[in-house]
């Protein structure tokens, strides 16, 4: 969750300092954040069944 907060703050800083017309960096960071988020979701989907096998309720 920390990477998400850092990327959000960095994106806001770049959006304010660069402006809307030159916000290429913001788009790149948004794509990176989306890719990281999707990778994290996929990782949780893979790990959850293994966790249930190791630590049953």
Swiss-Prot record:
Keywords: Antibiotic, Antimicrobial, Immunity, Innate immunity, Secreted, Signal
GO CC term (a single one): extracellular region
Record's subcellular location: Secreted
Keyword Transmembrane helix among record annotations: no
Lineage: superkingdom: Eukaryota
Induction remarks: In response to mating.
Predominant place of localization: secreted
GO biological process, one term: defense response to Gram-positive bacterium
Signal peptide segment: 1-23
Tissue expr: Ejaculatory duct of adult males.
Function per UniProt: Male-specific peptide with moderate activity against Gram-positive bacteria.
Family according to the record: Belongs to the andropin family.
Protein name, entry field: Andropin
Annotated organism of origin: Drosophila yakuba
């Amino acid at each position: 969750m920390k990477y998400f907060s850092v990327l959000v703050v960095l994106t806001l800083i770049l959006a304010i300092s660069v402006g809307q017309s030159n916000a290429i960096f913001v788009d790149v960071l948004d794509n990176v954040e989306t890719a990281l988020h999707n990778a994290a979701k996929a990782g949780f989907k893979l790990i959850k069944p293994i966790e249930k096998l190791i630590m049953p309720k």
